[in-house]
Amino acid sequence: MAIRTGFCNPFLTQASGIKYNPRTGRGSNREFLHSYKTTMSSFQFLAPKCLDEDVPMEERKGVHVGTLSRPPKVYCNGKEVPILDFRCSSPWPRRVNIWGEIDFRGDKFDPRFNTFHVYDIVETTEAASNGDVSRFATATRPLGTVITLLGMSRCGKRVAVHVYGICQYFYINKAEVDTACGIRSCSELSVLLAECLRSSMITQNDATLNGDKNAFHGTSFKSASPESFRVEVIERTDVYYYDTQPCAFYRVYSPSSKFTNYLCDNFHPELKKYEGRVDATTRFLMDNPGFVSFGWYQLKPGVDGERVRVRPASRQLTLSDVEIDCMSDNLQAIPNDDSWPDYKLLCFDIECKSGGSNELAFPDATHLEDLVIQISCLLYSIPRQSLEHILLFSLGSCDLPQRYVQEMKDAGLPEPTVLEFDSEFELLIAFMTLVKQYAPEFATGYNIVNFDWAFIMEKLNSIYSLKLDGYGSINRGGLFKIWDVGKSGFQRRSKVKINGLISLDMYAIATEKLKLSSYKLDSVAREALNESKRDLPYKDIPGYYASGPNTRGIIGEYCIQDSALVGKLFFKYLPHLELSAVARLARITLTKAIYDGQQVRIYTCLLGLASSRGFILPDGGYPATFEYKDVIPDVGDVEEEMDEDESVSPTGTSSGRNVGYKGARVFDPDTGFYIDPVVVLDFASLYPSIIQAHNLCFTTLTLNFETVKRLNPSDYATFTVGGKRLFFVRSNVRESLLGVLLKDWLAMRKAIRARIPGSSSDEAVLLDKQQAAIKVVCNSVYGFTGVAQGFLPCLYVAATVTTIGRQMLLSTRDYIHNNWAAFERFITAFPDIESSVLSQKAYEVKVIYGDTDSVFIRFKGVGVEGIAKIGEKMAHIISTALFCPPIKLECEKTFIKLLLITKKKYIGVIYGGKVLMKGVDLVRKNNCQFINDYARKLVELLLYDDTVSRAAAEASCVSIAEWNRRAMPSGMAGFGRIIADAHRQITSPKLDINKFVMTAELSRPPSAYINRRLAHLTVYYKLVMRQGQIPNVRERIPYVIVAPTDEVEADAKSVALLRGDPLQNTAGKRCGEAKRKLIISDLAEDPIHVTSHGLSLNIDYYFSHLIGTASVTFKALFGNDTKLTERLLKRFIPETRVVNVKMLNRLQAAGFVCIHAPRWDNKMNTEAEITEEEQSHQIMRRVFCIPKAILHQS
């Protein structure tokens, strides 16, 4: 590495031309309030004092705070380079040729291009200048919304295509408006709309629109005139209900989204508005057939031959190579081209360090002294999947280990470029300048949405007062924002929206694609890539950082390797392909596809289809008060796992998904263990097929019998849902819009899947992502109608779907029992099965469970080979007899052994030997390895040991009452041996503590928890107390439960004081002593501390936890009674006693003799006969050997 010269420490030297002014507060330079920076003469200086290598060690604590009067600079390869001066050679790659007011493209630059690819769309508002008479000015006077398509031309130019003339519009019922306003014509309505806008100056003089203080308001509203609007009368039909008749609506066109949004909220709020919240981007895509949100376009002359206009550099909105102005008729989408231009990916990771009195505290971006010390940036070409550049931004000098540099070279990777900075601000402004000048289209990292982006944005905003609105693609007034959007699955989630920079967080992708006990990057890399990282404990970072450039290089290596692993994960899972396919299908932007949920995907598709059929969509729909307690939407098989720090209110609703009805019960399972074959028949795409088969939709529903009684009975269907009669007309009367969408999507998916076998490997990957995207959207249709606070709720439709689904399962059960219960009828229907009959006398068929879209059918007296062969025929017979296409049953699997635990929970071995589980996690991320291992051993024994299987099947037939006087079946002895072995292991003096470590996620900062008396938070506070390595938010905290001792109790008291809730004393039972009441979470401890201090584990807790876990899984063997199961499993535990040594000595001195505990007869699986002497021993032990209280799991 080149020797750096001129590294500036303003606290030690006064370099020529540099003036340093110490300060204690934030910088107040108003220059920081501008958009992206091209010049800067001074800035706030924050740097750790540990970088002052020429001062005594005792003076290297804390952070320097002041203002430095010079332009920000970077050191690279021994040279000093101004960060913001574009004329100087850059230490990072640049893709822009315009910087500030200067155009560096040169005279020979050719702006022409014909085809271009779009990856993001941005809406802006323009006000035309008085002297501009172009057609583009006409579209923006007084205000106009402009749609900017961001992308890249086929010839490699980065382009921004500004589309003018896109009008938002909304509908309002003409009769209602005329009555409310006393008008009759479109011109009168235009006058009232303009007056409404102008009057906003009186009540909203200083108000902002949509939270944007830079938005056009005030004077722009004052200039609104009737000519600002185009109003027409058009006949349309409300999409809700079949009996809704077409009527006249005013359709109000507005050139500005600001006007539209204000009017929909404030112009006669009591009047229902239709499609007022449909933004200009959606109108652009919907009103122009074939237009896509992600894909290729070509330029063409307009309808009357109008051509596009190239913007000069002085008028560019972005730093693209070329910007043009056009109208929508200058564009034509290019279908069936799935190729990608050379888009770039930024993969980054930040390292932070607390600079306060406790350097191991959790960094907080609002704390001035908590600093970003390094940022690694890996730059990739997305279509080539190649790593092109490696950059390391370092606060202070940094020398990467030569070993690591050589490893990179040997692997054929780019040599890392190390960029060194005097202050944190220079590091951050350099990183933001890289983002602006390199202008990657995509960014990724690990937990960047919740931490990296959030920390950088907060630091620049709150500490340095630097606005980021110019650091996306838009040069000023753009969107560069991150915000919290509530809770999902009891975890906080955020979203980031940056104009022109699509952020894909691989943490979110990993949690979706993988099922792991820990989602740390190392764990994910091991599982997905079979790679591991060189770990650097957080507690070591301050020491490494302060020790000089060589050890800072170790931190840099750690930082770079994290980004490298994330880059590999990105190109393994290719999330950009699937999400771009969703965006294209749903005709929404890629950012919306990532962050805005399922509702918007269906809404936009429905909007386009409804418009083509003459329907309009009311804003917010018509929220029903409909209550139906027998059904709920079942949106998937994923069972969300509750975070242990939250509880669910039985009546409250969350800020997220609000369902207006509940229930989903079909019929309860016959729980138990089955060793007879069990066939599972599944409905293919149950809810979508129900919607199609029964023509369910907003448009086909009526609540009024008078509406349908004039129709033929075959032209409508009647369903009784929650005591209410609902009527849906058949497709020959009116076709369901939801059904049409599903039919088209499923046909598209089928066609795509048919292309995969004959495609190249690269094309096959892309096609597979496209078909998966269609499946995701199809499965969202049902849930779209069932969310009470959704875009367009219709709980009647959602409840009808689940009601029909339940009826289908019941009718399937009845058909099987009525037609195949008799052996003769069964053989007649399936003559090929006769050779597999084991016993005609033992023959029995019974449906033992109906699970939303599946039926479980048990056959006795017939071999599994024969049953497996007739499964598909069975499904076909039932489908043909009972259901309308496209509803059909399929034979998915046949179990040879099945443990049916409860609804949606079962474990079994399917024909062929594969184990299948649903709703049961043998390896739970909240359990320790000891419990997971033994739970797995018990399940494997049950499923693969035929002796145990037969005994378990026998046990599951025994009634609960009988177990009080009945011995366990002898075949269960194997179960007993495993449980006894677990007990021996946990009571052994040589325990491997790693097998007893549990983890829980720190889902938010500890101060944000309502209940802080949690196991993982206890460990967090103990680490703070001991100045240990502090976990980051969303990291999982490891802990073990220790035995209660005086030391543990003292630590619990200290933790209670630290978190602000001291333990309450309660009166003791002996001698009036006061004892603190400890709960399990108070006994949580850091595993490293336990090992180093020789603390004992809480044996009783762990074994009780094992028994409890096993009881939840195996309660189906014992009448589904968890408490009974615990008692029965504890029969296998050898009796042991913990003897107080002091008491034993006293007893022996008094003449007592030590005798053995009752013997266990393993052969008979019972206790041997207890002698009179042994009985006396038990009595004496209870009297004299009083053990200390041991906590049990609640």
Swiss-Prot record:
| PROSITE patterns the record matches | DNA_POLYMERASE_B
Alphabetized SUPFAM superfamilies for the sequence: DNA/RNA polymerases, Ribonuclease H-like
GO BP terms: namely: DNA-templated DNA replication; viral DNA genome replication
User: Primary place of residence?
Assistant: host cell
Kindly state which keywords UniProt assigns to this record, in alphabetical order.
Answer: DNA replication, DNA-binding, DNA-directed DNA polymerase, Endonuclease, Host nucleus, Hydrolase, Multifunctional enzyme, Nuclease, Nucleotidyltransferase, Transferase, Viral DNA replication
Enzyme Commission (EC) number: 2.7.7.7, 3.1.26.4
Name where it's found.
Host nucleus
Query: Metal-binding: is it a keyword of this entry?
Result: no
Q: Which GO terms describe its cellular component?
A: host cell nucleus
Give one GO molecular function term: RNA-DNA hybrid ribonuclease activity
Q: Is DNA-binding one of the keywords UniProt gives this record? A: yes
Gene3D superfamilies in the cross-refs: DNA polymerase family B, C-terminal domain (1.10.132.60), DNA Polymerase, chain B, domain 1 (3.30.342.10), Helix hairpin bin (1.10.287.690), Palm domain of DNA polymerase (3.90.1600.10), Ribonuclease H-like superfamily/Ribonuclease H (3.30.420.10)
This enzyme catalyses: DNA(n) + a 2'-deoxyribonucleoside 5'-triphosphate = DNA(n+1) + diphosphate; Endonucleolytic cleavage to 5'-phosphomonoester
Q: Which residues form a coiled coil?
A: none
Role, per record: Replicates viral genomic DNA. The replication complex is composed of six viral proteins: the DNA polymerase, processivity factor, primase, primase-associated factor, helicase, and ssDNA-binding protein. Additionally, the polymerase contains an intrinsic ribonuclease H (RNase H) activity that specifically degrades RNA/DNA heteroduplexes or duplex DNA substrates in the 5' to 3' direction. Therefore, it can catalyze the excision of the RNA primers that initiate the synthesis of Okazaki fragments at a replication fork during viral DNA replication.
Assembly and partners are described as: Forms a complex with the ssDNA-binding protein, the DNA polymerase processivity factor, and the alkaline exonuclease. Interacts with the helicase-primase complex composed of the primase, the helicase and the primase-associated factor; this interaction may coordinate leading and lagging strand DNA synthesis at the replication fork.
Q: Give the protein's recorded name.
A: DNA polymerase catalytic subunit
The lineage, from the top, is: Viruses, Duplodnaviria, Heunggongvirae, Peploviricota, Herviviricetes
